[in-house]
């Protein structure tokens, strides 16, 4: 299972409109940042000028790494033999500081999103992570879904998925991350991909890459998948295979990445950071760079699903801060698009470190990291489960409605939990007293899991706001650091 979408920026050919709400459906830089920042599930940055529509030449005899009981993954025939030899990666588009988008695509834009926001005062969803199946060929120790191989009852049918897409596009044209489980284990995935394209949404795929063959990579390109996200948690096979609970997984994943790149599909590597691998993060970044991928995103563990069984491996707050500080400095020189995810603290940290360097966090200097915020669950992001439950993110274990019973658009608009998450003034504890709350917000899923209250203070934050300590008022603290407590600075 792969759990991670990124952002766009620092590209001279990336034209972003200044205002949201113009007649042509363009969106502002802030809206684009929120669309492409992602949250919680399978974040996949969208590359500019993607070549994903150009299928590569492939061998007709490519074999499938494993058979699947209810039909081969992605509808690709083949036996249980392994991956072909490594295939060199093709040319890649590089992005830095913020996300990228495919040419001509404006996630969340268009008249429907404009009309929706004008009518309701609520932003339309810019990105939706959709667990199209919970079945998975791996049993990763941190999996938020505790996914396993085999059949899951009640999964949305193709017709139900299409009906939900039809409803979604009445209010937005979002990026839809097809995730799982392992989405390539769903035989009708290409019909889902094509239908998303047809209706004006942008499908991307979060995969563990072990099931990718030359044929599947070619299908990704043929069906215009601009990018996939793939999880790699260790720089070598021993640690990665243990974390993913599957011997040989590392080599299969690397082979899958190379085949996707050879087919012209963009690749993003995601790494879940725990006490097991925090000391190896530089080596994992170097591996990503050596594979010539497009992006490297680090994910901070959220202890849900099987992840709750390794709670002791979640980084303590001080180590959490160290990793995010490393990320701030490393992204300055990384050739990859580099972004922490499930780490809302990062948007506080970049402002603190920038101030120490005598800089202001602006789009010109920091790209779309300056335009987005940490937690976007219920604000411009949400999650759809394999059975149709709607959640703020995949880690937020609270079902706010089900698309089998109620249209997605109504749940997005009417859910009390969603509306609570949109109101920063409701945050409690030190998060409520924090001058950075409108750019960070804390991880609401962690708050729910640890405290039972999604509005409580982020449990894994080391920062002590001056207003919380009684040293000054919230407004005074916010003015001192130059941020708003009600919206983006």
Give residue ranges: language-model regions.
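C-terminal accessory region of radical SAM enzymes
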Residues: 2, 318-364, 389-441
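N-terminal [4Fe-4S]-dependent radical SAM core
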Residues: 2-129, 366-369, 477
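Conserved alpha-helical substructure of the radical SAM core
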Residues: 2-4, 8-12, 17, 34, ...
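Radical SAM/AdoMet-radical enzyme domain recognition
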Residues: 158-179, 185-316
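Short Fe-S-cluster ligation motifs
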Residues: 167-180, 458-489
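Short, acidic, Ser/Thr-enriched surface-loop or helix-capping motifs
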Residues: 290, 384-385
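Short, small/polar residue-rich loop motifs at catalytic or cofactor-binding pockets
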Residues: 375-379
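Cysteine-cluster motifs in flexible loop/terminal segments that predominantly coordinate metals
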Residues: 427-472
